[in-house]
Curated annotation (Swiss-Prot):
This is Cytochrome c oxidase subunit 7A2-like, mitochondrial. The chain crosses the membrane at residues 79-104. It is a single-pass membrane protein. The gene is Cox7a2l. SUPFAM superfamilies: Mitochondrial cytochrome c oxidase subunit VIIa.
Amino acid sequence: MYYKFSSFTQKLAGAWASEAYTPQGLKPVSTEAPPIIFATPTKLTSSVTAYDYSGKNKVPELQKFFQKADGFHLKRGLPDQMLYRTTMALTLGGTIYCLIALYMASQPRNK
């Protein structure tokens, strides 16, 4: 008699020899070809549908604006200053917190 683990009952159950020697989850590869997934669509659209997002693309204009070599890195004024200062404060605070945590972890407690 051969046994195989039943995923339904979560116990060993009797099985045929061919089932018992086939690992669960691994089955022999089928010889038939799988169906084609990426085929040419049968219905071709005559015009390309374009979505109107919120207007024209502003990326090229912003690239020219931010890549000007005028020696000034905060080009949009107060929002850039606030973002820069917040980022630097969080970075420094996180670094200090990590260093303190490493120091405390490296010092054993006396009991």
